[in-house]
Amino acid sequence: MARITVEDCLEKIPNRFQLVLAATYRARMLNQGHAPRIESRNKPGVTALREIAAGKVGLEMLKKVPG
């Protein structure tokens, strides 16, 4: 599987700071047991970045507060 790069994710979320926040929130959700939106056997942080790069997750993560 191809390596994920920040540049791939920045195409979807241009602001690096928002990218980090969105990936962090999504990784927390995955860690709490939410289903991944892509097939992945990686850790939650990598899976979150892959979802962002694939366009499955975006800035809407910033509107959700992980519980």
Curated annotation (Swiss-Prot):
Q: What is its EC number?
A: 2.7.7.6
Q: Name one cellular component (GO) term.
A: DNA-directed RNA polymerase complex
Provide an example Pfam family for this protein.
RNA_pol_Rpb6
Q: Which GO terms describe its biological process?
A: DNA-templated transcription
- Entry-linked PANTHER family: DNA-DIRECTED RNA POLYMERASE SUBUNIT OMEGA
Query: What's the family?
Result: Belongs to the RNA polymerase subunit omega family.
UniProt subunit comment: The RNAP catalytic core consists of 2 alpha, 1 beta, 1 beta' and 1 omega subunit. When a sigma factor is associated with the core the holoenzyme is formed, which can initiate transcription.
**Name of this protein:** DNA-directed RNA polymerase subunit omega
Q: Which gene encodes it?
A: rpoZ
